[in-house]
Curated annotation (Swiss-Prot):
<feature type="binding site">
    <location>
        <position position="139"/>
    </location>
    <ligand>
        <name>Mg(2+)</name>
    </ligand>
</feature>
<keyword id="KW-0665">Pyrimidine biosynthesis</keyword>
<dbReference type="GO" id="GO:0004359">
    <property type="term" value="F:glutaminase activity"/>
</dbReference>
<feature type="binding site">
    <location>
        <begin position="146"/>
        <end position="148"/>
    </location>
    <ligand>
        <name>CTP</name>
    </ligand>
</feature>
<feature type="binding site">
    <location>
        <begin position="14"/>
        <end position="19"/>
    </location>
    <ligand>
        <name>ATP</name>
    </ligand>
</feature>
<dbReference type="GO" id="GO:0046872">
    <property type="term" value="F:metal ion binding"/>
</dbReference>
<feature type="binding site">
    <location>
        <position position="351"/>
    </location>
    <ligand>
        <name>L-glutamine</name>
    </ligand>
</feature>
<feature type="binding site">
    <location>
        <begin position="379"/>
        <end position="382"/>
    </location>
    <ligand>
        <name>L-glutamine</name>
    </ligand>
</feature>
<dbReference type="InterPro" id="IPR027417">
    <property type="entry name" value="P-loop_NTPase"/>
</dbReference>
<feature type="binding site">
    <location>
        <position position="71"/>
    </location>
    <ligand>
        <name>ATP</name>
    </ligand>
</feature>
<comment type="subunit">
    <text>Homotetramer.</text>
</comment>
<dbReference type="GO" id="GO:0005524">
    <property type="term" value="F:ATP binding"/>
</dbReference>
<feature type="binding site">
    <location>
        <position position="459"/>
    </location>
    <ligand>
        <name>L-glutamine</name>
    </ligand>
</feature>
<dbReference type="Pfam" id="PF06418">
    <property type="entry name" value="CTP_synth_N"/>
</dbReference>
<feature type="binding site">
    <location>
        <position position="402"/>
    </location>
    <ligand>
        <name>L-glutamine</name>
    </ligand>
</feature>
<feature type="binding site">
    <location>
        <position position="222"/>
    </location>
    <ligand>
        <name>CTP</name>
    </ligand>
</feature>
<feature type="active site">
    <location>
        <position position="507"/>
    </location>
</feature>
Amino acid sequence: MAKFIFVTGGVVSGLGKGITSASLGMLMKARGFKTTNIKIDPYLNYDAGTMNPYQHGEVFVLDDGGEVDLDLGNYERFLDTSLTFDHNITTGKIYSAVIEKERRGDYLGATVQVIPHITNEIKERIREIARDYDVVVVEIGGTVGDIESMPFLEAARQMQLEEGRDNVAFVHVTYVPKLRVVGEQKTKPTQHSVKELRSLGIQPDAIVARSEDPLEESARRKISLFTNVPPEAVISAYDVEDTYEVPLMLEKEGLARYITKRLGLPEREPELDAWREMVERYKSLTDTVEIAIVGKYVKLSDSYLSIKEALKHSGVANGVKVKIRWVEAEDVEKHGVKLLEGVDGIIVPGGFGARGTEGKMMAIRYARENDIPFLGICFGFQLTVVEFARNVLGLKGAHSTEIDPQTPYPVVDLMPEQRGLDKLGGTMRLGAYPVKIKPNTLARELYGRELIYERHRHRWEVNPEFIERFEKAGLVFSGVAGDDERRMEILELPEKRYFIATQFHPEFKSRPMNPAPVFRGLVKAAKEKKFGD
């Protein structure tokens, strides 16, 4: 029988519930329990696929094609696992399912209500996933008191009643500010947040107190007294340099040990040696390389969270810290490529729409002509093709039909199966697809095998009618779709130091102990450029 750990948040959003949940899941897995994480997003969207990155950060793509909240990326990285679309529960999904059942007549004429029909649907989905696991960590998005979260908190309360207190625990993540005027940590916001939670019938078993500095003992005792939580279950979670330190901090504070005991699970020492070594290696790095990310959402770096993490993983693997230079693509259009001077590598990531397109291609040309290590991803792959068509093949006005439907040279075109679709949500080429890599190429050297599976999120592709012209001019398409060899997946320029682009998103499968090969190669090339071979 599975044990459930619900993680809730209070006071303010953006405290790091996702990292706390990922860390707790990782610590339970490190103890030998078969563990998974679920994210509940209380918005009415069915999934994250059509959301603006400036509002919610990147859209993370799963193997099964699910477009989900970026927290699931943290879960996958921390637990070194692959999740499914079912691991992301949204209000949109729940209400859609309940309305569909009502239309089908499943409720036999009953008045359909939030309680019990919505809450039952929520519990059913959580239990369905739990069947294969010992421990399930469920993060409830939003902040206690939000009207959107109410049905999910009620479902969690009911689950403790139905499963038994020994099988359900609650961890509440809250904020302890330190006012400069008085110079002490204030616990009142936490007290009120827990009071709100208790008014909903939920008594937290542990409190993770987020603060800038370690929690003062007086604050710990005060929180314990006013929230009815033992002092040892009031966990200090202060700011650290890197998120990968958080599991080690929470382990030192005893969170997983306390929850293990609270749920009646056997006490075990966690296997954390490899993780600890990875964190220590990262903290000890002194040499630095600078990689420019030229994008259209750079004002919110979480729009490219998985790319940031993949660079971090690759930095540790190559013995260098990676400093990111965030470059707004439109600024390149206004001020020129001088914004890229001095960088050791350039990434042009995915994105949609015309804004910043010319700036991205200016960055691609700058990398190509100055032999700067380069990686293009998804739309960056397509724009690399457009830039090459214009400036090497001399095809004036070449473009993607996404940006210019009337282009005389549609070197990037809508995939045939995408034509005629009238819905945006969930209709792209999504999820893991096979990619066949040609021998004697950089891609084969990086991946070390012929067949790989990588995650995709696109509607446009390289127009097969132009492939021969590109190849004659020296552009190598080193990877093709395993299910359709006319669909290009990887390109490279062999005469360059490191110049590669992928139609897929390699960042989504990068892990702290196993960096994505094309990122690892990019950082290696950047290091060699700066420090010599």
